[in-house]
Structure formats: structure tokens, C-alpha cells
């Protein structure tokens, strides 16, 4: 009996202690601890609820805390009128030397009423990289966690480089990222261009934060919330557990050679600050240092790397490469994840003409643009498209790091660009063989059918950099 009483007192004390550590970010009758960081939409506090109303002719408006926070656990409830997009900034800052619409930058907890996409709880890099660091594309349970037309409970845990989010008790993200260590928290009402959205609202309540003794309050991660690791040259404990390894060690030529050499090229490639760069030359295939390939061959695998293109650049990641093919001029032969500046390289918008032979004459049948040479595409075979959103493929910008991911498993192949799936196919299928028959690869017998092959980084005569090249065999 005494033991039960002691346990009850301990649990009661623990509960009281826990509640006392939390700090409410909503005062009873004012917003004195908040300030407008950007925009001109109105935020109102009434009965413990902060509400913001959407208006035309203003950039996104942010109501931010005056205090900056580094490590914390943040909880809140939120209601978003259908049709609106919103978010909660954290570890964010303001830059007053840029146009107002991009003044606030930093991590954003996405609030998304688009049920076809369902990325609420995802992490967007607002006005900095301007893309999702963690889109909800590999977590179906997380994608369905947010419910339109009701209050939703949200939680953010930001400790060191680890950022995790939950909605209604369902884990949405598991991100490792070093971009921001400290900043304000801000509530967003997104800018609108559609008059039908005028007057719609976003509402928050029960906003509270915990900043001390965080370890004992952190939640266990769920296996369904795939980890995304943006830390340079580091394999996380989770990645090591799942048999990831670096395909390039970041410092030496070990494990790589020239595609048409027995050693690594003596020129044309440089290694600096854990970055592997192919240097610019004449814009032609393999005329400088030449392509490089792995010493090993791979069959079923998941490959991930970060790449950065210079303006107008062209390159590629090839897999199932047979270096005994094409011993002459040009690149080695294999399936290719195209890397290219879609906007500034003409090969991404290469024109074609289809001729039809009839009654002894060749007649023009169709003019068009070969869209299967754009970034992320299976070069000259399948165009990369945005398969996770009802919108066009998100762009790749010169001089910014982007992520390529290739999955190969028993003939099934996927290309991912910045954690968004852009194509999938079966390399042993009838459809694939038909595509090859009408491509530049038709002259290579059984193209793409190898059981295993090398992985290749292409020298196309343009400056392109690579880092964090990692792989796991499936």
C-alpha cells in the first residue's frame, strides 16, 4: 500500500513538474510578446485564440515571437480554412536587405489543406533554399495525419540538428539538418491571389514551448517516418543500422577510376573540402578528364548524392554501366539520371522532327521538343515529372545543392529529385524495350539489361560538383 502511495505521489509530482516547465506563448489579453515580421494581414487574439484573416495585395504575413529559441519542443493546435496554405516558422530570421515578400527566412512547419498532396507537417525552407527539406513523400501515414475542417494538434521537436514533427500524434518528419540553430517562431497567413479566398482564416490556440530538460520529453521516432539526412559527410546511426555506406570517402580517389582507364584521371577532376568536382572544358562528352566509375559493380541498390551545377551545365549519373562498350569517343554506356540546367542548356529543350515515308517521299509528320533530356529524366527515354504533386517538376537552380536518389530493385527503378519522385519504370518490361528501340541506345544490344554494372559520374565538359555520395545494397 505504501509503495502504491509513493508511486502515486511521484507520478503526481512528475506531472506537476512537467506542466510547470511548459511556457504558454499566448497571454490572456494581448500579443505583447509577438510582433509582425512581414506583411500586412491582421492577427487578432480573442478568448485564447490567435486568428489571421487572408487578404489580397500583401505578401505572406508573419506574426513572430520577440524571443529567439534554439532547442525546444513546441506544441500548438491549429485550424486552417479549406483552400488556404499556412505554416509555422521556427529557428527563423529576418533579412531587411531584400524585398518584403522574402524577408522572413528559415524552417517552416507546413500547413497544407490540399488533400491530394497532404504535406502538412513537412518542413519547407522558406525564402532560403525555397524548397521542401522534408516533403511528405515517403510517409503515407504522415501524409494523412492532418484533417481539414477541424482543429489539429501539432508538435515540433528541434534539438541540435534533429528536427521532428507530429500531427495528431502521427509522426510526419524525421530530419537531420544544420542550416539554422536559433531563431524566432512565427505564425503565417499565406499571401493569396484568388479572390474567393479573401476572408478565410487560420487560427491557433494552446501554443506552448518547452526549452529545458528536453531529453526526458523527447518522443520515440517511428520507423514509418523515413529519416532524411542533410548533414555533410556523416552517416547517421539510423543509416548505419540500415547498411548505408559512403561510395566516395570525400578525400581520396579510392573506389573510383576513369571509365576508360585503370586509374583515376590525372586531370579534369578535383577534390576540395569533401566535394568532388568535374571541371569545365569544352562542353563535350569525356574530352577532358573523362567519366569516372566505381570499382565495384551493383545490381539492387539505393543511391543518394548531392549535386551542384554551374549555369548551363550538363552531366549525369549512370548506372548498369559496361565500360567495355564504347571504347571510342564519347561517354560510357548505361542508364542515365540526367543532370542538366533545364533553363540554360539547349539539350534540355532539343527540337526534333518526325518524318513519314509515303508514296516515295519523306513528309514532315510532327515537330516537337525532346522532354526526356531534362534534369531527373532517364536520358533520352523517359521524361522526369512531378509524381507527388499536381504541379510541374520543381526546378533545379545553378550554384545550389540538390539531391538525386536512384532506387533499383529487381528491375523496378525510381528516380527522385530533392525527395520528390520524378519517374519509375521496369527495365525488363516490354515498354522499356520499345522506348530503347526508338532512342539513341537502339544500336546497343540488350541496353539496360545487365544483371550488374558500374555507377558513373559524367564529364560532359561543364563544371558540376558532387558530395555525400552514399549507397546501400538491397
Model feature map: region roles:
Residues 1-20:
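Bacterial Sec-dependent N-terminal signal peptides
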Residues 19-474:
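Carbohydrate-interacting regions of secretory-pathway proteins
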Amino acid at each position: 500500500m505504501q509503495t502504491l502511495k509513493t508511486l502515486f505521489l511521484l507520478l503526481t509530482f512528475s506531472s506537476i513538474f512537467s506542466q510547470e516547465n511548459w511556457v504558454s506563448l499566448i497571454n490572456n489579453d494581448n500579443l505583447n510578446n509577438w510582433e509582425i515580421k512581414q506583411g500586412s494581414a491582421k492577427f487578432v487574439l480573442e478568448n485564447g485564440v490567435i486568428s489571421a484573416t487572408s487578404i489580397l495585395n500583401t505578401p505572406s504575413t508573419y506574426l513572430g515571437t520577440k524571443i529567439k529559441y534554439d532547442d525546444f519542443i513546441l506544441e500548438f493546435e491549429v485550424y486552417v480554412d479549406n483552400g488556404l496554405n499556412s505554416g509555422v516558422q521556427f529557428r527563423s530570421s529576418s533579412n531587411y536587405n531584400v524585398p518584403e515578400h522574402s524577408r522572413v527566412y528559415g524552417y517552416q512547419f507546413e500547413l497544407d489543406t490540399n488533400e491530394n498532396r497532404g504535406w502538412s507537417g513537412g518542413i519547407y525552407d522558406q525564402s532560403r533554399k525555397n524548397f521542401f527539406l522534408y516533403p511528405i513523400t515517403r510517409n503515407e501515414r504522415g501524409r494523412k495525419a492532418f484533417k481539414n475542417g477541424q482543429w489539429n494538434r501539432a508538435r515540433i521537436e528541434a534539438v541540435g540538428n534533429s528536427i521532428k514533427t507530429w500531427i495528431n500524434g502521427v509522426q510526419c518528419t524525421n530530419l537531420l539538418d544544420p542550416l539554422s540553430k536559433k531563431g524566432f517562431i512565427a505564425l503565417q497567413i499565406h499571401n493569396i491571389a484568388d479572390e474567393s479566398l479573401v476572408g478565410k482564416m487560420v487560427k491557433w490556440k494552446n501554443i506552448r514551448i518547452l526549452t529545458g530538460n528536453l531529453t526526458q520529453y523527447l518522443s520515440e521516432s517511428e520507423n514509418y517516418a523515413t529519416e532524411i539526412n542533410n548533414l555533410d559527410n556523416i552517416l547517421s546511426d539510423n543509416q548505419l543500422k540500415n547498411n548505408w555506406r559512403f561510395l566516395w570517402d570525400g578525400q581520396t580517389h579510392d573506389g573510383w577510376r576513369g571509365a576508360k582507364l585503370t586509374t583515376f584521371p590525372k586531370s579534369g577532376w578535383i577534390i576540395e573540402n569533401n566535394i568532388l568536382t568535374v571541371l569545365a572544358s569544352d562542353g563535350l562528352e569525356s574530352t577532358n578528364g573523362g567519366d569516372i566509375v566505381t570499382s565495384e559493380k551493383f545490381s539492387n541498390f539505393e543511391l543518394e548524392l548531392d549535386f551542384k551545377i554551374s549555369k548551363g551545365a550538363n552531366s549525369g549519373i549512370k548506372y548498369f554501366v559496361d565500360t567495355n562498350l564504347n571504347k571510342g569517343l564519347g561517354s560510357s554506356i548505361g542508364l542515365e539520371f540526367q543532370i542538366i540546367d533545364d533553363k540554360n542548356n539547349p539539350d534540355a529543350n532539343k527540337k526534333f522532327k518526325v518524318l513519314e515515308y509515303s508514296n516515295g517521299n519523306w513528309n514532315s509528320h510532327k515537330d516537337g521538343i525532346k522532354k526526356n533530356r531534362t534534369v531527373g529524366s532517364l536520358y533520352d527515354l523517359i521524361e522526369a515529372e512531378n509524381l507527388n504533386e499536381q504541379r510541374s517538376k520543381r526546378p533545379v537552380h545553378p550554384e545550389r545543392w540538390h539531391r538525386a536518389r536512384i532506387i533499383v530493385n529487381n528491375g523496378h527503378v525510381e528516380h527522385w529529385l530533392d525527395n520528390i519522385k520524378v519517374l519509375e519504370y521496369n527495365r525488363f518490361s516490354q515498354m522499356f524495350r520499345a522506348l530503347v528501340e526508338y532512342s539513341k541506345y537502339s544500336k546497343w544490344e540488350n541496353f539496360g539489361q545487365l544483371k550488374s554494372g558500374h555507377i558513373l559520374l559524367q564529364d560532359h565538359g561543364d563544371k558540376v560538383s558532387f558530395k555525400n555520395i552514399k549507397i546501400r545494397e538491397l
